[in-house]
């Protein structure tokens, strides 16, 4: 059953050094505030999983929190590369980073398999692809019924999944709407799940066929308004395109990046204080 906690309390209790951690959210509802809190608390040796690593994982990798990344695409959307990710892979700064690259369909199916309690996922994929040549976790099996060759990949079972959502009720049930990626599957695949939300209400008034994550599947719900900035939260605020553009020169240089996180993340007590500090600089 989900507890209503501060984000600081949730990260302290449920994210441990060495954990496999998935921060999911596609296009919007990206759990930025949670990534900041993981950095503030100095979590390390993490195996990060995310279908589309963007700024949140550039931050975590550059801050020295990660030892491995499982992913299916990485970049600063609409801008360019993730320079802290590249620096870690190419030059081992601040830590050497092991990478485990998959296709989108592969990783989505891996989450589904994890949520289903299965050891691996099976899919039609990788015909003509070079990924199986460089990723030993992509294997091939023959269907026992038709003989067809299929790809097989390990399921993803995070120690903890973190997502951002629009609403939760006071019992800890969570409502998401708009574009959904694999938040539901990642939450159900995990041993523990933290959800940050824009607001906590008495009644979700959930529309038919909406995505509701029940309290029994979650560990903690944290009230963090604006917690997915600079991504958008459908129905609450728009994407901050200027922030994504401004991130590129910050992340390109090690000293500039380190000074930025020291001032804006390690130098603030929580995401609310971070937001106020960012607003001052605009």
Curated annotation (Swiss-Prot):
Q: In which pathway does it act?
A: Aromatic compound metabolism; beta-ketoadipate pathway; acetyl-CoA and succinyl-CoA from 3-oxoadipate: step 1/2
User: What EC numbers are recorded for this enzyme?
Assistant: 2.8.3.6
Q: Could you tell me one molecular function GO term of this UniProt entry?
A: 3-oxoadipate CoA-transferase activity
Q: Which reaction does it catalyse?
A: 3-oxoadipate + succinyl-CoA = 3-oxoadipyl-CoA + succinate
Q: What are the protein's UniProt keywords? A: Aromatic hydrocarbons catabolism, Transferase
Q: How is activity modulated by pH? A: Optimum pH is 8.4.
Q: What is this protein called?
A: 3-oxoadipate CoA-transferase subunit A
User: Of which family is this protein a member?
Assistant: Belongs to the 3-oxoacid CoA-transferase subunit A family.
Task: Output the GO biological process annotations, alphabetical, semicolon-separated.
Answer: beta-ketoadipate pathway
The record describes its quaternary structure and partners as: Heterotetramer composed of 2 A and 2 B subunits.
Per the record, the domain of life is Bacteria
Role played: Catalyzes the CoA transfer from succinate to 3-oxoadipate (beta-ketoadipate).
Pfam families attached to this UniProt entry = CoA_trans (PF01144)
